[in-house]
A protein has these predicted regions:
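Lectin-like carbohydrate-binding module/patch detector with strong preference for beta-trefoil
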Residues: 387-533
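Extracellular glycoside hydrolase catalytic/binding regions
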Residues: 162-165, 169-190, 194-336, 356-363
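Active-site mouth of glycoside hydrolases
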Residues: 24-243
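Short Gly/Pro-enriched loop/turn and capping motifs at secondary-structure junctions
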Residues: 310-314, 345-347, 495
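Aromatic-rich peripheral "rim/lid" segments of glycoside hydrolase catalytic domains that contact
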Residues: 316-404, 514-520, 524-533
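Disulfide-bonded cysteine-rich modules in secreted/extracellular proteins
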Residues: 20-25, 397-401
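Cleavable N-terminal signal peptides of Sec/SRP-targeted secreted and luminal proteins
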Residues: 2-19
Length: 533
């Protein structure tokens, strides 16, 4: 494949097969046999619009499956439509393409994957799952829609139980078929109940009724898989569970909640460019915690899986950049399981258009290359398991710069540099106003002036070695220089490979209208807890 070699070498180390089946222990997904944590770092592969996973007319199946593994993903969220099993069970891949006048896609499939043409759509899905499994990639089967179509809108007839195309009985039938079908396929490690419940028919009592029915049905037919449950309002709202938990007793340690987030969620796109980014990030992460993050704690604690987030990877958009930098920071702090939308680089058919590009896709439109290597690098820390509650290793800090995806490393010249996050430098920090020390040593980070590199020093007693969060910021680590000026850690790869200190870009008040031409994300550094080897 034509992936950039450096990226391949970084990510291939975690592409090995994971142990299945999986289970849960409080907020963590674990190996059912050993009890050790298994972090899911996944890509979405759309298969519901044309009832076949995308891209099989562009590259051989094994090439695509291997590509997901080489990009570092240990699982794929593979979407499907229930009609594929309840209305089109005997339809072959070739017939499906012919019915949709997908002449060009059929020609490409004949070239790259002729072995799939005579298979039913369901058997072709199984072939895709087997190919992923052969490369150590687990599968989450996601029930995206009933009638095959692009998802989602409030009035598409696919949004909630009882909608035009969303028959609860047909839905339960499909869940039963899929659960039974993959009972003996260990790399299918999870099934979702339904993607992004939404629309005018939304009703909490109906949600409880069918979520309980669907979850119990899947677990009865296939007790090996995790069962993913989505909330209301496009899978962002679970607040109603605070006072009325699901009566599932965690489904024998198989219950997982899922949530989604984009820059445009709840009409917030313009806020990412027109509002103070520090203010916006603080309030959005608080909103996520309020609506879904609380599920990770308490007596009914369960894993929270971010099964969709993503940005346009084909252009430099300020709103998307600010959003994803904020979200990655929050995800790293909490070491969440996640799935990027999207893995796929194109579609057979979408909204009446043949072979459109997926600009959010990790693959490009040729399915040969990584679309955006810089964004791929941004994922290097969150691809890793950072926190293992069952680890015996001592906790340390990783210094994470979410804008670039790099980590703060101790350079041989006794300065702080930005480098890779694999086997990165370990730091220790005791909290507000204390030094940031190179773990296991007496050396610490010292600021020496505006625009100058941060030094590693033996003098850890003065203000220039005392670090705390800047006012009204969650992520800007600051101290004072000898003149009493507040300086923040700052990294801009276009300026220097070293981490500098520069004047802090912060508001005097927690003000949503505080906007400057220079944005603060280059100064965002997190000290993330880790106990990984």
């Amino acid at each position: 494949m034509n992936f950039i070699i450096a990226i391949l070498l970084i990510f291939i180390s975690i592409s090995s097969s994971q142990a299945v089946p999986l289970s849960t222990k409080s907020r963590w997904i674990v190996d059912e046999d050993t009890g050790r944590r298994v972090k899911l770092a996944c890509a979405n592969w759309e298969g519901h619009v044309s009832m076949l996973p995308e891209g099989l007319h562009k590259q051989p199946l094994d090439h695509i499956a291997r590509g997901f593994s080489l990009m570092g993903f240990n699982c794929v969220r593979l979407t499907y439509a229930t009609y594929m099993f309840t209305h089109n069970a005997h339809l072959t891949v070739a017939q499906n393409f012919e019915n949709n006048n997908l002449t060009s896609a059929l020609k490409g499939m004949t070239k790259h994957n002729p072995q799939l043409l005579g298979l039913t759509l369901a058997d072709a899905q199984k072939a895709v799952i087997d190919a992923l499994g052969s490369h150590g990639v687990m599968v989450l089967l996601d029930c995206q829609v009933s009638k095959p179509m692009w998802c989602c809108s409030n009035d598409d007839g696919n949004g909630f139980f009882g909608d035009q195309y969303f028959s609860p009985q047909d839905w339960l039938k499909a869940l039963s078929i899929v659960a039974k079908r993959y009972k003996d396929t260990p790399m299918v490690m999870a099934m979702s109940l339904r993607n992004e419940l939404r629309g005018p028919l939304q009703n909490q009592s109906v949600w409880y009724k069918y979520v309980e029915k669907g979850a119990k049905l899947i677990h009865r037919e296939n007790p090996n898989v995790l069962v993913l449950i989505s909330g209301l309002d496009y899978d962002i709202d679970f607040t109603f569970l605070k006072n009325n938990p699901l009566p599932l007793q965690n489904l024998n340690q198989k219950l997982v909640y899922e949530t989604h987030r984009y820059a445009f969620t709840e009409g917030q796109l313009d806020f990412w460019t027109n509002t103070s980014i520090n203010y916006m990030c603080k309030n959005i992460t608080q909103e996520i915690e309020t609506k879904s993050g609380f599920l990770r704690s308490g007596k009914d604690a369960a894993p929270l899986f971010i099964t969709e987030f993503g940005i346009n990877l084909s252009e430099d958009d300020q709103a998307d950049s600010s959003f994803v930098t904020c979200l990655l920071a929050w995800m790293a702090q909490n070491d969440l399981d996640w799935a990027i939308w999207a893995g796929h680089g194109s579609y057979y058919l979408r909204d009446g258009n043949q072979d459109p590009e997926e600009t959010y896709g990790m693959f490009d439109a040729t399915w040969k290359k990584v679309r955006n290597p810089d964004f791929h690098t941004k994922l290097q820390l969150v691809l890793q398991t950072l926190q293992d509650p069952f680890s015996r290793h001592e906790t340390y800090k990783v210094m994470y710069h979410p804008l670039s995806g790099t980590c703060g490393v101790a350079h041989k010249n006794q300065v702080l540099a930005a480098g890779g996050c694999w086997k990165t430098t370990q730091w220790s920090y005791r909290g507000e106003g204390s030094p940031i020390r190179l773990k296991g040593t007496n050396r610490c980070l010292m600021a020496v002036g505006d625009g100058l590199p941060v030094l590693l020093s033996d003098d850890c007693s003065g203000e220039s070695s005392s670090w705390k969060l800047a006012k009204n910021s969650m992520y800007q680590l600051a101290n004072k220089d000898e003149n009493g000026n507040h300086l923040c850690l700052d990294f801009d790869p276009h300026v220097s490979k070293m981490v500098l200190t520069t004047k802090c870009i912060v508001a005097e008040e927690d003000d949503p209208d505080y906007i400057k031409l220079q944005r603060p994300e280059s100064q965002w550094f997190l000290l993330v807890d880790s106990n990984a080897k």
